[in-house]
Amino acid sequence: MSDLQALVSQLWIYPVKSCGGVSVLSANLTETGLEWDRAWMVVDAQGDFVSQREAPRMALIEPKMRHLEMVLRAPGMLALHVSLHEAEEPVQVTVWGETVKAYDMGALAGQWFTDFLSQTEEGRALGPLRLVRFDPEFQRASSTKWTQGVQALNQFSDGYPLLVLSAAALAEFNERLTAQGLPPVDMARFRPNVVLSEVAAHTEDHAKALTIVTDQRSVTLRPVKPCPRCSIPNVDPQTAELQPQVSAVLASYRQDARLEGAVTFGMNAIVTEGLVPANSDEPEAVLKVGQAVQVQVF
């Protein structure tokens, strides 16, 4: 094993699962990942989560975090103001077949999403929809098959608290796109939380640990599982139009034997050192763009 030096070049949160992301300069590192990441989710009448796979227009919904509220904007819609600290009745919802406790955010929020996401790309009706907030008292853990027995908690992510990606991986992918006469894409397609610069493409694939010395304490992230890619990177986040050539180019060189040939891009990661217990008065570690990262590679 050897050590490399990287930098945190971007930090992203996605407050509403499958909606637009927010590029931030700093973020508190909580036991479920970056603060406010995937804290809300859109569900259908059965309580099943809705994503860009069924509703590409979710990519056009832009969240903005304020002191006491989240403000959501979308083309042709009035802004929706969502309280950060209030919710309505408790509900049970489903994420990838897993039942999760949540709170409904009310009729106004539900109608807003129903109106904007009224039908799928194929014309199938989606409504009625609801916006729900993750119940912070509920513990939703990552698969210990991949965490080597470590309990890692999530909110509404697909299964892990963090997604790490190297900036060079995107640059390499864009070189492959342009070589085929296709336009380059931006980082928003791949929805990472932590982007690393100053290292080679896909260094995260071979990293055993990522150590960041924050102002509060040293934290260690462990990449544990390659991130399999579905159709979401095909969705242009600016237009919500589908561009299937993105997946086709990925599949040409990113089939991963660790996941039986699935196409992967980026690594799901957990926090192994530096978290503050939920009942502690200590401040949480704050990740910042520009922080140095010690990358221990196999």
Task: Pin down the residues of each PLM region.
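Metal-cofactor-dependent catalytic cores
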Residues: 1-298
